[in-house]
Each structure stands twice: as C-alpha cells, then as structure tokens.
A protein has these predicted regions:
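Oxyanion-binding/catalytic loops of NTP- or PPi-dependent enzymes
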Residues: 1-206
Length: 206
C-alpha cells in the first residue's frame, strides 16, 4: 500500500525466499498527500472567510505549506492551531483530526476501491494476504491506517521506513537490471540471489 505525496499504488506480491513475484498492481497517479494538503487549505479558507468575509488564495503555496504542517501534526495529535496570514490580517485557525479525516474520506475510499480491484484481478481475498506493508509518507495519517486495517482484517506491518522503502526498492531494481561496478563482491552476491518478476502498473494506451 504505497500512498505518497502525489501518487497511489497497491500491489499484491508473493515472496518466496529471495524471489519476488508481482501478481497484480493498480494505481492512481493523481492521488496522494497533496490532495490531503489541499483539503486542509480549504478548511483554512472556510474558517477565514467565516470571520473576515473574504477568501484566501488556495493557489498560494504558503497555504499548502501550512496545510502540510497541520497534516503532520494531526497524525500524532487530535487537534492543532495554526496562525494563517490572509488578505485581512493574521488569524489563528484550529483544525481537528476529525475535521481533517472527514475532508479526506473521499480519497481514502478511492484507495479502498483500488485495493478491491487488485483483489478481484488476482483472485485473492484479505484472508489470503499474510502481510500488509505501508510505503509513502501519507500512510502516517491515522485514518488511512484505520481504514486499511478494517478492510484487510489485520493491522499493517510496522518496521518498514515508509519514506526510504521506495528508494531502497528502486536501488535493488536498478541493481538487478544493470551491472553496478560500485558494488563489492558481497553485495553482488546478495543481489544475484534476488529474483523479481514485475507487471505494468498502469494502462499504457494503444
């Protein structure tokens, strides 16, 4: 379950010893944490307008950056306050986790639909999935974890660095596809034992 800043992917893979067989994969290249940030910025706008009767510019990166800060805080706290500068001066705005989760529910539902598509395409069901791995910074959002746990009937596995997993995977994949002369003999031997079969993640068109 890979939910990053701008994309979402879900993959079912079978791992035996050091062989990784990708069975099915689905994704949405326009769904990610940036959508969560925008929804928080919309909450800023709603509350600012209520008090000042004027709107803030949601295209301004300042509000998106402030929204991202709020998102990170709400991953560990139930609510937070943020000072927001608007057309009619600064305003302290309070955002609760409950408000945030309600605002992003549509996006979480989209990820659930893609999981169900992957399950159907592979002929699998949640009971046959041994482990659920999270990748991508947006998987820190409690509502995401809660939704996934409920759907799969088990909590995701902890211990994987959600920020570094993609980079590590890409490095291994590149090593499998090319001859990397910077590797020492021990690293080359370890890499030679890894076998990966992959599928195309997205429809490529005709």
């Amino acid at each position: 379950y890979d939910l990053g800043g701008g994309t979402f992917d879900v993959t079912i893979a079978e791992v035996k010893n050091k062989k990784v067989d990708v069975i099915t994969s689905r994704g949405d290249k326009y769904l990610g944490g940036k959508d969560f940030d925008l929804e928080i910025a919309k909450l800023f706008n709603k509350k600012y307008k209520l008090q000042h009767n004027t709107e803030i510019d949601l295209n301004n990166k300042y509000y998106i950056q402030k929204a991202e800060e709020v998102k990170k805080i709400l991953s560990v706290k139930d609510k937070t306050r943020m000072n927001i500068q608007g057309p009619k001066g600064e305003m302290e705005i309070e955002i609760s986790r409950e408000e945030f989760e309600e605002a992003i529910q549509t996006y979480i539902e989209k990820t659930k639909m893609l999981i169900e598509e992957v399950m159907e395409a592979s002929g699998m069901n949640p009971k046959r999935i041994n482990q659920v791995l999270l990748v991508g910074g947006s998987t820190r959002v409690p509502a995401v974890i809660k939704s996934l746990t409920k759907l799969m009937g088990k909590p995701p596995v902890k211990g994987v660095n959600v920020d570094e997993a993609v980079v590590c995977g890409a490095a291994i994949y590149a090593g499998l596809k090319t001859e990397n002369k910077s590797l020492n003999e021990k690293q080359k031997e370890a890499l030679s034992q890894v076998e990966l079969t992959d599928v195309c993640n997205f429809y490529m068109g005709t």
